[in-house]
């Protein structure tokens, strides 16, 4: 009997006993997607009694609840046989170990002749529903998994005041001496999403973001400009608010300035000196890193690295070259405040520790910032705050805390959260390289919402590559999204009017029936979209996956807009209504405008013309010239005009209601 080669390979695989756990290679048809550094074993046999087996390679993701009923179902589409595999609890790490960055392109797997999916008690595995009986949940019943830099892994989020559902979050703000750049945009968009997610999950969040308003850079810039430091600071704080507000970020609960907490800073310095963690020298106060053997636990750096580090300034007054300044003695031309050690000003690191303790308390739930702040800023903050609360040397730094004067042991910060770097055209952003961009420089050419969309398209912990092409694509995607919403809402009004007209023609009131056809499909897709977005954001703020979930409902909405007659139009209004609501809910959850409408589309068109160096009259003239060429059947001229404007980012349309729309510029810069 002749067998197709694929059939022979499938039968050969089924007849050959082989354990998943012992396979060193990756089979092209079967892949274990959920286990990192783990293995899998066969759990059942196929229907014809043959042993179930396949080659597998440890995947890049771990499935939560491993070893507790979590299974991998495999169906061979050629032989029609189903196999079931379970994770080996003895070989799989616990669910709390480090997960890699989420893959925004991960979709239901269909490779070769095999379709597979993970199931946990019949549900798709996700942080929101995996191990629901053991994982802590938020007020809305979900579990938020958050990557903790201190632990180097994702953990279920549990606030200190879980009973009252209160969360305290502190994010390091800007040093206000210049306009904010796209690196700042990355930080504050990321933590705006976290703030929104915590609020959506039902937590009462106190969000604090400071301003460093006394610093060497501020003093230098004020002297260069010939203005007072206070005037410079006020001007750039206003500019910061304008830029960040334009990106759609919610204002924090409070925004303290360092200079408003000088008394708290000097008190903290005194306490550290009394406890033996700091010392004064000629009007300066330094923190002694040798007093804390655990110093470096957050960044993973050792004291030996600091001593040998080339960036450590040599100062003979220091006990250790790595000791850092808590208080700086006064210098001519600098703002100063009185202190027990004479006139001076605070160091950078002590400011955040003092403000956190004064406003939020000795322990907080979340401390955030850019990855560049892990060392030295956050490492030094952790050392200062932990040491100030210790009444002895017991306890571990940041890992359960030391014993405090107020009772139970509690770490300074429960969850350290950091976002990844921003690169420009794959290079480090630097003024010397000429690739340094402020937020307002970018938003003069591109819509702020496009910049936010671009930032959301990369997971917050991953490095992001800023390119002009990425912004072009973000702008194009936004135009498609909001154009679809505008057309869908118009179609919804039309569909509801037709439903009302049909109902008026019916003499007897119809009995309520469950939704069927398009209505049922629309309701289901809307529910699936909402669930997918909730699951993505609960899994360490996976914004790429959340916004990717919009693709299916947007495509369906476009189909519904063009479906106006026949049986397919029955239930159209219900599907439109639910899908529009699902899209708008997703937009709101990641901080994008819920209702952009024609206003946002018009702004996108205006910015396109500005980038292209064109006016409305130029476009109208091109449209007219192209129409004449087409009427004369001069299609070569028509194509030339279209391509000329397309290269500038203006797509001339051949039909429909639109005459032209923004388009992605092909040239990648």
Where are these regions (language model features)?
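N-terminal chloroplast transit peptides
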Residues: 1-25, 29-105
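N-terminal mitochondrial targeting presequences
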Residues: 42, 115-135
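N-terminal alpha-helical targeting/anchoring segments
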Residues: 110, 126-129, 176, 194-202, ...
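Alpha-helical recognition segments enriched in aromatics with Gly/Pro capping
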Residues: 126-177, 192, 242, 263-491
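Structural preference for alpha-helix termini/caps and helix-kink/transition segments
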Residues: 129-131, 428, 437-669
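N-terminal, positively charged nucleic-acid-binding surface of large information/translation enzymes
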Residues: 151-248, 653-661
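Short phosphate-binding/catalytic loops that engage adenosine nucleotides
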Residues: 203, 277, 650
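Short, solvent-exposed turn/loop segments enriched in Gly/Ser/Thr/Pro and often Arg
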Residues: 207-215, 257-259, 372-374
């Amino acid at each position: 009997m002749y067998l197709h080669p694929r059939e022979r390979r499938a039968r050969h695989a089924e007849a050959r006993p082989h354990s998943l756990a012992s396979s060193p290679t990756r089979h092209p048809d079967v892949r274990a997607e959920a286990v990192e550094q783990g293995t899998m074993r066969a759990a059942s046999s196929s229907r014809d009694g043959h042993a179930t087996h396949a080659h597998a390679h440890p995947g890049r993701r771990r499935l939560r609840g491993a070893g507790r009923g979590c299974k991998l179902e495999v169906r061979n589409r050629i032989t029609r046989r189903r196999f079931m595999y379970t994770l080996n609890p003895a070989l799989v790490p616990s669910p709390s170990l480090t997960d890699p960055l989420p893959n925004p392109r991960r979709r239901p797997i269909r490779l070769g002749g095999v379709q597979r999916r993970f199931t946990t008690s019949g549900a798709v595995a996700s942080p929101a529903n995996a191990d629901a009986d053991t994982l802590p949940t938020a007020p809305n019943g979900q579990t938020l998994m958050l990557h903790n830099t201190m632990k180097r892994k994702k953990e279920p989020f549990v606030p200190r005041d879980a009973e009252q559902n209160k969360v305290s979050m502190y994010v390091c703000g800007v040093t206000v001496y210049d306009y904010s750049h796209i690196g700042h945009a990355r930080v504050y968009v990321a933590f705006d999403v976290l703030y929104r997610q915590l609020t959506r999950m039902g937590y009462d969040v106190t969000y604090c973001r400071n301003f460093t308003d006394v610093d060497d850079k501020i003093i230098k810039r004020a002297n260069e400009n010939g203005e007072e430091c206070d005037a410079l600071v006020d001007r750039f704080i206003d500019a910061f608010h304008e830029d960040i507000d334009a990106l759609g970020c919610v204002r924090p609960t409070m925004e303290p300035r360092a200079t408003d907490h000088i008394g708290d800073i000097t008190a903290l310095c005194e306490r550290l000196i009394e406890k033996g963690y700091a010392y004064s020298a000629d009007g300066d106060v330094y923190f002694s890193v040798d007093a804390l053997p655990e110093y470096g636990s957050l960044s993973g750096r050792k004291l030996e690295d600091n001593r040998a580090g080339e960036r450590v300034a040599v100062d003979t007054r220091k006990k250790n070259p790595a000791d850092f300044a808590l208080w700086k003695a006064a210098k001519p031309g600098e703002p100063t405040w009185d202190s027990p050690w004479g006139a001076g000003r605070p160091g950078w690191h002590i400011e955040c520790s003092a403000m956190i303790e004064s406003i939020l308390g000795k322990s907080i739930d979340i401390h955030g910032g850019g990855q560049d702040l892990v060392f030295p800023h956050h490492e030094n903050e952790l050392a200062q705050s932990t040491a100030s609360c210790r009444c002895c040397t017991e306890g571990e730094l940041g890992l359960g805390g030391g014993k405090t004067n107020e009772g139970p042991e509690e770490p300074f910060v429960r969850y350290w959260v950091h976002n990844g770097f921003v690169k420009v055209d794959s290079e480090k952003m630097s003024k010397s390289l000429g690739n340094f961009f402020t937020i307002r420089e970018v938003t003069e050419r591109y819509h702020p919402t496009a910049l936010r969309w671009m930032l959301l398209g990369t997971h917050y912990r991953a490095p992001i590559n800023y390119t002009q092409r990425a912004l072009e694509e973000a702008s194009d995607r936004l135009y498609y999204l909001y154009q679809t919403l505008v057309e869908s809402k118009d179609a919804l009004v039309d569909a509801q009017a037709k439903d009302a007209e049909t109902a008026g023609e019916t003499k007897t009131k119809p009995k309520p029936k469950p939704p069927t056809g398009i209505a049922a499909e629309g309701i289901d897709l809307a529910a699936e979209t909402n669930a997918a977005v909730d699951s993505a954001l609960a899994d360490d703020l996976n914004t790429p996956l959340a916004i990717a979930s919009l693709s299916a409902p947007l495509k369906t909405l476009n189909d519904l807009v063009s479906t106006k007659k026949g049986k397919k139009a029955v239930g159209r209004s219900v599907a439109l209504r639910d899908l529009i609501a699902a899209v708008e809910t997703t937009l709101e959850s990641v901080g994008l405008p819920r209702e952009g409408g024609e206003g946002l589309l018009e702004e996108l068109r205006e910015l396109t013309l500005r980038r292209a160096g064109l006016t409305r009259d130029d476009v109208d003239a091109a449209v007219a010239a192209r129409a004449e060429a087409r009427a004369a059947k001069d299609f070569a001229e028509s194509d030339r005009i279209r391509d000329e404007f397309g290269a500038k980012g203006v797509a001339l349309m051949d039909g429909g209601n639109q005459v032209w729309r923004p388009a992605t510029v092909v040239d990648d810069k």
